[in-house]
A protein has these predicted regions:
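Short, glycine-/Ser/Thr-/acidic-enriched flexible segments
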Residues: 1, 25-26, 39-41, 74-75, ...
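Catalytic cores of nucleotide-enabled group-transfer and carboxylate-activating enzymes in metabolic
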Residues: 1-3, 7-14, 19-32, 57-64
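Acyltransferase
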Residues: 1-5, 11, 156-227
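Glycine-rich, charged/polar anion/phosphate-binding loops
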Residues: 20-21, 81-84, 111-119, 146, ...
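Interdomain boundary/hinge elements
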Residues: 26-27, 98, 109-111, 193-198
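Active-site-proximal beta-strand elements of phosphoester/diester hydrolases
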Residues: 36, 128-132, 166-170
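Catalytic beta-strand/loop cores that center a nucleophilic Ser/Cys/Thr
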Residues: 119-163
Length: 227
């Protein structure tokens, strides 16, 4: 698992009780299952097949539990992962969980960028970032897909199977209140009643900046930089 910070907001939002697990028996107890990012998608996918977690996730999906994937988790949710250049290992084709009609092709070029987007059909402006290897496309070429995120430049990210199952390359997607409200929908919780994590982070940055100003001679640093 990588990018633990994707889930910090869930630890602070009172609507959710977050727990991490690699045990199959714990998966079925959850109302929402999130497959996180990883630096070794294929190896970790093989690991969850071996320990029974993959089967438990598929069973939860069939029981209409909410299942979402972020980055590597999104790749796992597809039909298969192809690695013709053996970027991640010797295996060139690995079966995915089959929850989303997608195919991922691993590449040795890494995508790294910040993104502004709109989630589903909501009007709220959202922010996140991408850091991944590989491209993910519909299983059948030319197939119309239901886009999850529409980026500011008009490009798209992610796939939405229905209200309860989607995947995205977007890290930080849960930091956006509209996404958390959507995630909590159906559980009898009022929208907008959660924790504003983005505002919380800004306050923490301001506090940190204040401490740095107290401890560091910024005027001297600026003078040496000719600012």
């Amino acid at each position: 698992m990588s990018n633990f910070t994707d889930f910090n907001v869930l630890e602070r939002d009172g609507r959710f009780h977050l727990y991490y697990t690699d045990k199959a028996e714990e998966i079925g107890k959850a109302d929402v299952i999130i497959l996180p990012g990883t630096k070794s998608t294929i190896a970790d996918l093989q690991a969850i097949y071996a320990n029974g977690v993959a089967e438990a996730v598929v069973k939860a999906f069939r029981k209409k539990k909410k299942v979402i994937g972020i980055c590597g988790g999104d790749q796992m949710m597809g039909v298969r992962i192809e690695d013709p250049g053996q970027v991640e290992g010797m295996q060139t084709v690995t079966d995915g969980l089959g929850l989303l009609p997608l195919v991922t092709v691993m590449q040795d070029t890494k995508v790294v960028c910040q993104s502004h987007f709109r989630f589903k059909n909501y009007e709220s402006d959202c922010a996140g970032y991408q850091i991944h290897m590989g491209t993910t496309t519909p299983l059948h070429a030319g197939e119309r897909q239901t886009t999850l995120n529409t980026l500011a430049d008009g490009t798209t990210d992610g796939y939405r199977l229905n209200a309860d199952c989607w995947g995205s390359y977007m890290h930080g997607i849960l930091d956006n209140p509209v996404v958390l409200d959507d995630l909590a929908a159906g559980f009898g919780v009022a929208a907008g009643s959660g924790f504003d994590y983005r505002a919380f982070k800004e306050r923490q940055y301001d506090l940190l900046a204040g401490q740095v100003r107290k401890a560091v001679d910024l005027d001297y640093i600026y003078s040496t930089l000719y600012l």
